[in-house]
UniProtKB/Swiss-Prot annotation:
Keyword S-adenosyl-L-methionine (UniProt): yes
Subcellular location: Nucleus
Annotated organism of origin: Zea mays
Name under which the protein is recorded: Histone-lysine N-methyltransferase EZ2
Compositionally biased tracts (Polar residues): 395-421, 503-513
Domain CXC: 627-731
Pfam families: preSET_CXC (PF18264), SET (PF00856)
Region (Disordered): 1-25, 395-447, 491-513, 867-894
Catalyzed reactions per annotation: L-lysyl(27)-[histone H3] + 3 S-adenosyl-L-methionine = N(6),N(6),N(6)-trimethyl-L-lysyl(27)-[histone H3] + 3 S-adenosyl-L-homocysteine + 3 H(+)
Coiled-coil segments: none
Protein origin, superkingdom: Eukaryota
Transcription keyword on record: yes
GO biological process, one term: heterochromatin formation
Extent of Basic and acidic residues compositional bias: 872-884
Length: 894
């Protein structure tokens, strides 16, 4: 027992000693920091004193010079005033002498004039005067008509579209100033004591000396908790403020350093697409297609659709070259791309080529190789080229690749011409017993050597790369010169072969051209490696948007960076156009071909079974019941339901129970990320002509406007077709349920109302249910609307309009002329909340036929105790007694 107690005592002593040593070490580490900071403070204070003394001396000298200049100006002014006073004294004495002589002569007497008033008749007055010049004047009064004053109103800002309230415009938590209508006295009061804001904590403002102290301390000892705690003792600031200030100082010094200049001088092409689009994603609104959207705000949640645009390739015959460097100007590229995107390659293909005066036909029986050979080798088997005379034409072959050809194939095949178009450069196995082969060579069996030929060499031999090279890169210029020589030599060889050279001479040419093909391949690798990270990302984005259209990609995304032929070259050699087939050569493309393959896989996975049956798109059945939820239309009919704010969902494929749209009871819109075949997605209408303004239209029945992107027959054209947009219909028909979207409002005039204050008047006559305009304003919360409503009640005005469960429209400060339309129990207009492109908007419509210059009224739906005196119904009228009251005198759409 004694030994155990001694052991425990020794262990406790050791722990205490360790803790004491730890505290001593911490204190020892703090001591030098404290001493260094004390020395730094002394240096800062001494420097501060020297700076103050120097500043005082400079100020003293400046003040002395300024005082001397003011003294000189004052002295000059005094001398000038003395000379002026002397002249005035002489003239004053002369005037006094003249006045004395006049008094001596008796001229100083004044005439006494008396005026007498006499009322002759109503509205007239006679004035008579007595004296040396007696006169009588008759004055007639004119009564001016009474003109009422213009109704007072504050300045307002016109809005053609709703905007969200700015954060600094809120009245919640602020003391308001009210004006007493009787005594015109300003009263500062608040609705409740809870609205009085609590005093904010004062922030510490750092001086130059404190900044110098923080910078030196962090540079010498680093920024850790011990240094921050010691700095808090010398500087009256919190640790968080010191850490923030140190970061600011670090960034400020980084900008002035030389390394930051080098970083900023780098080209933006080295950045990736995500880094470049960082500010774009924060500022650009994908729903309104504008920057700095005032309606949806910045930094929105990015929602990308799961279904991407299908890859398409327009026929080259229907396209025009986009410029002098367009791939369409080179027939070899045109044929190559046409063959790349031709889906009917199961049978033979025939090409006609011209070289000098000779004309040949290429007959190919296509049969794909195995996947193993395609993965091991990215090269393409050649084809048989037969001349009109039946002679065999020999092509150039890569030496290193011809050695890998099986002997069985060599015994039965022979090399063919390299003048084939790139379109024919696929891995094909040539059948020597095809029917077309015997047709062109009757009675004579030909032997063809099968060889693997590099498709890069064929492309570069037929295309003069120096015409499209980038003059900014010297390496590419030198490579282009080499390719010009290769091109010329290849053409000479082709002519000789066509004239019928011997097989031995032809094989020598093959050996020479194999080296040229390898040099061409090296140049191609350097050309493809010149693509920066941003250019590659832009190219992939162009593939996603425009498909395999190098013209549109170069024009819209790579303008000034790459030409059309360079994009086509990269597209062909990188295997983007063949991404759907296992025939890619990844020796050059590398990971970027895999990225494009990922794009294709995502696109194929996004397509549902409904689009994959029988190899063609299946038409969806549109009915008025499939447009959305029937319950939405039922709630729309009564006019008393509260609309729900829409927010796009980011669901992939089909929406489930966790979908935010389904949870809130709204339909998925075109801005959602879900599939087009989602059961919760609103599919628009396919109404016939002039049916979109009836209850049979699912859009109109659901209080929605038709969307040209969703509805089948409701489309808009605003051009002549020069930009590829659809032409206008010949009958001039246009959907009548897109007035808010197209802003086709009537002309509204502003004038004095016969009811109260200002009023809105229609300029031209309108018919029943015609769209008049939109009620715009600020989008505020319901809490903000309650606070503002108390202020508006004091001014006996109402500009609040219930929009949905999240926002209220306030047109007091910002709005349009329809905000002046007054309330009436027997209105000629009505307000209706419509869903336009995912946003709720208030439209004003004519309830009946309205003549020109007639004032507009609509029912605010006041409660019995909320309507002002001028808006109350006359006694005995019991119409609409059951009007629904919405908060504080808010306007409500039916």
């Amino acid at each position: 027992m004694a030994s155990s107690s001694k052991a425990s005592d020794s262990s406790q002593r050791s722990k205490r000693s360790d803790q004491g040593m730890g505290k001593d070490a911490a204190a020892a580490s703090v001591v030098p920091i404290h001493a260094n900071l004390t020395q730094l403070i002394r240096q800062v204070q001494s420097g501060r004193l020297a700076y103050i003394k120097e500043k005082l001396e400079v100020n003293r000298k400046t003040l002395q010079r300024h005082s001397c200049s003011l003294f000189d100006v004052a002295a000059a002014a005094e001398v000038a005033s003395r000379g002026t006073d002397g002249g005035n004294a002489l003239s004053q004495r002369a005037a006094e002498r003249q006045c004395g002589s006049d008094l001596a002569n008796g001229i100083g007497e004044r005439d006494v004039v008396s005026v007498q008033e006499e009322n002759l008749a109503t509205g007239t007055l006679a004035l008579s005067s007595s004296g040396a010049t007696a006169q009588r004047t008759i004055v007639r009064f004119v009564k001016l008509p009474l003109v009422e004053k213009i109704p007072p109103y504050t300045t307002w800002i016109f809005l053609d579209k709703n905007q969200r309230m700015a954060d600094d415009q809120s009245v919640v938590g602020r003391r308001r100033i009210y004006y007493d209508t009787v005594g015109n006295e300003a009263l500062i009061c608040s609705d409740s004591d809870e609205e009085i804001p609590e005093p904010e904590e004062e922030k510490h403002f750092f001086t130059k000396g404190e900044d110098h102290l923080i910078w030196r301390a962090t540079q010498d000892h680093g920024l850790n908790q011990e240094v921050v705690n010691v700095l808090c003792q010398f500087i009256g600031a919190t640790p968080s403020e010191i850490e923030e200030r140190s970061e600011v100082l670090f960034e400020k010094n980084e900008k002035h350093s030389g390394s930051s200049d080098k970083i900023e001088s780098r080209l933006s092409l080295d950045k990736t697409m995500d880094a470049v689009l960082d500010s774009f994603d924060n500022l650009f609104c994908r729903r309104c297609l504008v920057f700095d959207c005032r309606l949806h705000g910045c930094s929105q949640n990015l929602v990308f659709p799961c279904e991407k645009q299908p890859y398409s390739f327009d026929p080259d015959e229907n396209k025009k070259p986009c410029g002098h460097l367009c791939y369409l100007r080179f027939p070899q590229w045109r044929e190559g791309f046409k063959e790349m995107h031709d889906d009917g390659l199961a049978g033979g293909a025939t090409y006609t080529m011209e070289s000098g005066t000779a004309s040949q036909r290429v007959d190919v029986n296509v049969m794909y190789e195995s996947e193993d050979s395609n993965r091991q080798k990215g090269n393409i088997r050649s084809m048989t080229l037969v001349g009109t005379s039946g002679s065999k034409i020999i092509s150039s072959v890569s030496a290193e690749e011809s050695t890998t050809t099986p002997s069985a194939d060599i015994s039965e095949t022979e090399n063919v011409s390299s003048d084939l178009p790139p379109s024919s450069l696929r891995k094909h196995k040539i059948s020597k017993h095809g029917p077309r082969y015997r047709e062109h060579s009757p009675g004579k069996r030909q032997k063809v050597f099968t060889s693997d030929i590099s498709f890069e060499g064929n492309i570069m031999n037929k295309l003069s790369i120096p015409e499209i090279r980038d003059t900014r890169l010297e390496s590419r210029e030198s490579g282009g010169d080499k390719l010009r020589i290769l091109d010329e030599s290849t053409k000479k060889t082709s002519r000789k072969d066509m004239c019928g050279e011997s097989p031995a001479t032809t094989m020598e040419n093959v050996g020479r051209q194999s080296n040229k093909v390898s040099s061409t391949k090296n140049f191609l690798e350097s050309t493809l490696s010149c693509w920066s990270a941003l250019e590659r990302d832009l190219y992939l984005k162009g593939i996603e948007i425009f498909g395999k259209n190098s013209c549109l990609i170069a024009r819209n995304l790579l303008s000034g960076l790459k030409t059309c032929i360079e994009v086509a070259n990269y597209m062909y050699n990188n295997g983007a156009a063949m991404a759907k087939r296992p025939l890619l050569n990844k020796s050059i493309s590398g990971d970027f071909a895999e990225n494009e393959q990922d794009y294709m896989e995502q696109d194929m996975a996004a397509r549902t079974r409904i689009y994959r049956r029988r190899g063609r798109n299946r038409k969806l059945k549109y009915t008025w019941k499939s447009a959305g939820h029937p319950t939405v239309r039922k709630r729309t009919d009564d006019g008393k339901q509260c609309y729900t704010q829409y927010s796009p969902c980011a669901c992939q494929q089909m929406c489930g129970k966790d979908c935010p749209c389904a949870d809130k009871g709204t339909c998925c819109e075109k801005y959602c990320g879900c599939s087009k075949s989602c059961k919760n997605k609103f599919r628009g209408c396919h109404c016939a002509k002039s049916q979109c303004r009836s209850r049979q239209c699912p859009c109109f029945a659901a209080s929605r406007e038709c969307d040209p992107d969703v509805c089948r027959n409701c489309w808009v054209s605003c051009g002549d077709g020069s930009l590829g947009e659809p032409l206008a219909r010949g009958d001039g028909y246009q959907c009548g349920n897109m007035k808010l979207l197209l802003k086709q409002q009537q002309r509204i005039l502003l004038g004095r109302s016969d009811v109260a204050g200002w009023g809105a008047f229609i300029k031209n006559p309108v018919n029943k249910n015609d769209y008049l305009g939109e009620y715009t304003g600020e989008l505020i919360s319901h809490k903000e609307a309650d606070k503002r409503g108390k202020i508006y009640d004091r001014a006996n005005s109402s500009f609040l309009f219930d929009l949905n469960d999240q926002y209220v429209l306030d047109a007091y400060r910002k709005g349009d002329k329809l905000k002046f339309a007054n309330h009436s129990s027997n209105p000629n207009c009505y307000a209706k909340v419509m869903l336009v492109a995912g946003d709720h908007r208030v439209g004003i419509y004519a309830k009946e036929h309205i003549e020109a210059s007639e004032e507009l009224f609509y029912d605010y739906r006041y409660g019995p105790d909320q309507a002002p005196a001028w808006a109350r119904r006359p006694e005995g009228s019991k119409k609409d007694e059951a009007s629904v009251s919405h908060r504080r005198a808010h306007k409500v759409a039916r």
